[in-house]
Amino acid sequence: MSTRTPTLPGTRAATDRVPLLALLAPLLLFTHGIVDWVDGLDSLDGLRGLGGLGGVAAARDEGALSVAAGVLLVLSVAGFAWLTAGLGARLRHLPLAVPTALLAAFGAGATAAVWVGQITGLIGHSAPAALSSGGGVLTAVALAMVLVALTVEGHLPAGSLALAAVSVGIMLLPWGLGPLASLVLLIALAPLTRPVEAD
């Protein structure tokens, strides 16, 4: 799935991981949404067994599904941050590679830090929404900036950018449609799963 990019003689060949990341990051987000949904089923009907599957000793009161959902979210945001950095490197005319990579990396780090804080009890689950989802939002903003720049430079179809915007709109709906939004985003990023031709 990864391709080799041409390099100068005597240097190591760089591997383009964008095609793999464009597939993997939305699938991780989809899996997170499904696991999070299943984890929340126990609060719907009073069954105290489905979401808290045995608990993990290091996770205190967290159930195994809650821990798995958190890990999947952190991995997904990290995948989107890495994808943002890889796509930023493809930009030729707009100097957005470094700022977007830094913003995405900060967002991924913030997501991981908040998750670790919640799982260890340093940050309660009643933390403000801006704190608990801020890292993912920063990474999404960085990815959106790179996708717009790629569309402006002609490296990404405008339809893909429109589908990515639709996926953001679906994600913002209050009905927990994260898995659907991630599938729409997977379709939007499909052109990026093809290896890029050397200039």
Role assignments for model-derived ranges:
Residues 2-199:
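Hydrophobic, aromatic-enriched alpha-helical segments typical of multi-pass transmembrane helices
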